[in-house]
Amino acid sequence: KATIKAAIINAKKSAPDSILINFHKAFNKPVTYNIPYSKSYPAAKEYTLVNGYRGSLTYQDGQWQGFTSNMDVVIDLQKVDTIHLVQANFMQIIGPGVYMPKYIEVQTSVDGINYTNQGRDNNSVSPTESSLLFKDFKIQMKPTAARYIKFVSKLQSGFQFIDEIIVE
């Protein structure tokens, strides 16, 4: 895992703008969508979830991918690797109908056919909580050999927005 922070310095601003990129094990790896994302909120399309960027405070920043149904994706690490953590950040702001998922589930496979369940992380945020909230859903596991990571989130209501699936 490597994290790089880059800044563009503008003489007219008092503080530099910066971008934080997380180079985790799934960074820039192929993602297969078993259920498509919303055409209204595609973000960076097939690379949104593995581009290393976390979203900002708004789901319209081009880093948050929206779903109006359950989410079901498979990340191909392109080689068998040892992993111990899969996490993803979701947003909730109920005014425009954006909710946390009910839960996330993670499965792993070395061949893309036979999957092993690695766990479920249930949502702990009330669907009536009206303030803008973010939650990292996490599945920690004993070190596991995997090439394919299946990530599923269960829609609670309205939209669900996710910015990155981090694999370590």
Predicted regions and their residues:
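Disordered, acidic Ser/Thr/Pro-rich linker "stalks" and the adjacent N-terminal cap
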Residues: 13, 17-80, 91-98, 120-131, ...
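Extracellular recognition modules
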Residues: 5-9, 150-152
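Contiguous beta-strand segments within globular domains
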Residues: 83-87
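Trp- and acidic/polar-enriched beta-sheet ligand-binding modules for extracellular glycan
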Residues: 67-69, 94-168
